[in-house]
Design a protein with these regions (language model features):
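Glycine- and acidic-residue-biased ligand/ion/polar-headgroup-sensing regions
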Residues: 56, 64-77, 81, 225-237, ...
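A structural feature that tracks compact, well-ordered secondary-structure segments
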Residues: 207-210, 236-238, 251, 258, ...
Length: 324
């Protein structure tokens, strides 16, 4: 019997191969979507898409999955639990499980949507339930300072500017009050800003923005969850399971649980991408860096060389008995 092929643990979809098609015509007008990550890429946990709504609407409905989003272009209106909010590029948020929502766009708008758990297959019971037509109420402007706002956020370029974040924020600044909950994380030439997580009431996934400075690197590692990356600016080299790719704006890359991957900025330019993960990361052991365990292996090898031959033999037999 021939050995079964191992499941592929990563997938690249180039911008050139990303195709928008009409979807959900029973409940939407003017909507097109490209399925970037899903069952067809090997994902068990997420459905990532690029949506475009041109002079159209999506009727009021609920999902039995969570849906995060990030606005790329345009000013669509999101009706979330009956309240309309006009969004703009950089706006993002989460639509919790079971919360009624609808969309309307007077012009053209594009956004990334992230669904977790992965939407059900066509031959399974539905995970989407239409409630009625799209509301027509006049929307309000997005105000992220309003403490009643639970699910929405707005990312600006200054939120990723580490030098600006070194100075104090004005009490009248039109942003969420600065704190550890809204902080940007900087390491190894990389800046990470959380957009959608438990702070915005996401329970099943996360979404965040990633900036790489010239020469930045993330050494080989893997995770106990899946990740997807949608390129926005610059070029980055990614190595996944020993295969190397160059990612450019509009490209989508996905890594499965246990896919060992690394990122290298090699052109001397700034890089930015939108990243998602599902399930949400655990409190500990989100990363498993290869270099840490290689270090342990090296140390163990040095210890073994320093031991008498007899002692090394006894350690080996004891280990063999313990592991069976």
């Amino acid at each position: 019997m021939a050995a079964a092929l191992a499941p592929r643990r990563h997938h690249l979809l180039s911008a050139a191969d990303t195709t928008l098609v009409k979807v959900f015509e029973d409940r939407a007008v003017g909507l097109q979507r490209a399925e970037l990550v899903g069952a067809h890429t090997g994902s068990a946990h997420m459905g990532l898409g690029l949506a475009e709504l041109a002079a159209g609407r999506i009727d009021n409905h609920v999902h039995s999955h969570e849906e995060g989003f990030y606005i790329l272009d345009g000013e669509p209106v999101l009706y979330l639990d009956g309240r309309g909010v006009r969004l703009k590029p950089g706006a993002c948020g989460v639509i919790p499980v079971g919360v009624p929502h609808a969309w309307r766009s007077p012009g053209s708008a594009r956004w990334i949507d992230m669904r977790a758990p992965r939407p059900r297959d066509p031959d399974q019971p539905t995970d989407t339930f239409v409630l009625g037509p799209t509301p027509e109420a006049e929307p309000s402007e997005l105000d992220i300072r309003d403490p009643r706002n639970r699910n929405l956020f707005l990312l600006t370029d200054s939120d990723m500017d580490i030098d600006r974040l070194k100075t104090g924020a004005s009490v009248a600044a039109p942003t969420v009050s600065a704190s550890m909950a809204t902080a940007a994380l900087a390491y190894s030439g990389i800046t990470v800003k959380m957009l959608v997580d438990q702070r915005t009431d996401a329970q099943l996934s996360t979404m965040f923005m990633v900036d790489y400075q010239p020469g930045a690197v993330a050494h080989p590692h893997d995770h106990p969850f899946e990740e997807a990356y949608y390129m926005l600016a610059g070029e980055i080299n990614v190595v996944a399971d020993n295969e190397r790719y160059t990612l450019r704006p509009g490209d989508t890359f996905w890594t499965a649980t246990s896919c060992i991957h690394a990122f290298y900025e090699t052109t001397g330019n700034h890089v930015r991408w939108l990243e998602t993960s599902a399930p949400g990361p655990p409190n500990r052991h989100s990363y498993r860096f290869q270099r840490d365990w290689e270090y342990l292996q090296e140390q163990r090898g040095e210890d073994a060389q320093r031991q008498p031959t007899g002692a090394r033999g006894r350690d080996t037999s004891s280990s063999d008995r313990a592991t069976g």
